[in-house]
C-alpha cells in the first residue's frame, strides 16, 4: 500500500512502515527493525546500510560503498522500541532526505512536518513545503498551497498562525504561492521542477 503523505489517523491500524532502496534490492527495515543479515547505523544522523543483497554497481559506475556500507542520503534516528525493549539500538525512524532538510537561521525544519500541519487547515486541499535561498537566513520556508477553493484561499498570515499553534515560529512559511494543484508523478511524488516560482 502506498500511503505517501497520508495522515496517520486515516491509516488502517495494521499499517507498518518499511524502508528500502533500489541499491538494497528491496526492503531492509520492517516496522523499524532491520531484517536479518542487514546492518543499519547512523553517522551524523545519516542512515547507512550494509546487506548481502546490495547491488554490485550502478549501470554506469560503481556504488559509493565504504567497507560495504552505503550512505543512503536519508536522515534517521533510533527511537525506543514500543515492543519489549530488546532492541539494543532501538527502532529506526526515517526522518527524511538529507537534501529536503531546511536550515533557516540555524534552525532545522522538516518540510513533511510543516506539510502535515498545513493540511489540517480547512482551506488547504494539498501542500508542498521546500526551502528557498535567502541572503539573511540561509534559507526560508516556502509553501505551495492548493486551496480547497481558489475563490477563497487562505492568507499567508492565517497559515503562519495555524503552524505556530503547534510548531516553532521558525517552521511557519515565510512565503506562499497558490496553485490549482500540486504537480505529482503517478506514484504521488511531488514534481518539484514543475512548481512555479
For each feature predicted by the language model, list its residue ranges:
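Hydrophobic/anchoring residues in structured secondary elements
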Residues: 2, 129, 177-178
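AMP-binding/adenylate-forming catalytic domain of the ANL superfamily
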Residues: 167-190
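Residue-level recognition of short loop/turn positions
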Residues: 44, 89, 185-187
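Gly/Ser/Thr-rich phosphate-binding loop
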Residues: 1-32, 39-41
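Phosphopantetheine-dependent thiolation modules in NRPS/PKS and related acyl-activating systems
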Residues: 189-197
Amino acid at each position: 500500500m502506498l500511503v505517501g503523505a497520508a495522515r496517520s489517523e486515516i491509516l488502517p491500524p495494521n499499517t507498518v512502515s518499511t524502508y528500502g532502496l533500489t541499491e538494497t534490492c528491496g526492503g531492509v527495515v520492517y516496522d523499524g527493525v532491520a531484517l536479518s543479515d542487514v546492518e543499519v547505523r547512523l553517522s551524523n544522523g545519516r542512515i547507512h546500510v550494509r546487506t548481502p543483497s546490495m547491488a554490485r554497481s550502478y549501470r554506469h559506475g560503481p556504488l559509493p560503498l565504504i567497507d560495504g556500507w552505503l550512505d543512503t542520503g536519508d536522515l534517521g534516528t533510533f527511537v525506543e522500541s514500543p515492543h519489549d525493549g530488546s532492541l539494543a539500538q532501538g527502532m529506526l525512524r526515517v526522518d527524511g532526505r538529507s537534501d529536503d532538510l531546511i536550515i533557516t537561521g540555524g534552525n532545522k525544519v522538516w518540510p513533511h512536518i510543516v506539510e502535515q500541519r498545513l493540511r489540517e487547515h480547512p482551506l488547504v486541499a494539498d501542500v508542498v513545503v521546500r526551502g528557498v535561498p535567502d541572503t539573511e537566513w540561509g534559507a526560508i520556508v516556502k509553501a505551495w498551497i492548493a486551496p480547497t477553493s481558489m475563490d477563497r484561499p487562505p492568507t499567508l498570515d492565517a497559515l503562519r498562525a495555524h503552524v505556530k499553534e503547534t510548531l516553532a515560529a521558525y517552521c511557519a512559511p515565510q512565503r506562499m504561492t497558490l496553485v490549482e494543484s500540486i504537480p505529482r508523478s503517478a506514484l504521488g511524488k511531488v514534481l518539484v521542477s514543475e512548481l512555479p516560482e
